[in-house]
Amino acid sequence: GVRLSRFVQSVTRDFPTSLLYKSFRNKRIKVNGKKGVPEDRIKAGDLIELYINDEFFPPEGAKPAHKPAPKKQQNQPKVTVIYEDENIAVLYKPTHLLCHSDRTGDANLVDAFTQYLAQKGEYDPHGENRFKPGICNRLDRGTEGLVIAAKNYAALRDMNEIIRTDLLKKEYYTITVGIPQSGRFTAWWEHDEKNNKVSIHAHQSQDERRKQIITDVDVLRTAGPFALCKIGLVTGRTHQIRAHLAYLGRPVLGDIKYGNRKMNERTGTKTQALCAVRISFLDIPEENTLHYLSGKVIKLKEPQIVKQFDGLDKSRQEAVDVS
């Protein structure tokens, strides 16, 4: 029979490898009503269910096996490598850079990383490669910070397992509108997938569809109505930081979806002030090929968000001096 992961790739278009494996983890790919795994072999008569965004499927009537029309050529940005070994690299993603390619053809981190490896002679984009280097943890387009990239299939598989079993912890810096309390906050999260928007609630719903979220907040500095905060994710869900802080009445500065529109306009901030600054690996099992990362901490030394906060503080002080 055909390997399930290969079948899914054959009927989708522009579906990133990292999202493919995330879909397996999140039970969005099923065989005969049960959770599928990439290694499953499927045969005639099997019922395959794919709960995947429509954008990754060819238009009705098109042949999925055919390649899509070429995208506009795009020079990829130079990759900033924070850490690298033979299996993975930890990259810095600036604000506005996509993680994966989309139909706009805009520059993206995956293609930039692939180009970087090709220039080093570690990857042949024109060869008969079954595996294309991919990223393991996605950041929203407007979020900057650390992203883990896999150079080979085993690294991608095992890093996804590390993430799935919560053996990797991430910390963020953010600037909030309003000064939050420091502490651990718990709430209930619900995702409207159609509109890609999250709502946060104090209690579980009757149908128990909501999922619990836990967010750690540590206020590092304040400047008037703004706070520079360190955020720790005990759980990691879509838009968790942005939506949870908005629910607490202290939204992320520059957040168009959940934020304070007036303050965004007043400060001229057009994207969310959020940066993934630190990745910590816990005790990884010996059978995992990335076991050697156990206990390793990777940090972003000079996050742009700190300079952004310094600018807000300076502007506030100048306004006080003038008055």
Regions found by a protein language model. Name each.
Residues 1-323:
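RNA pseudouridine synthases
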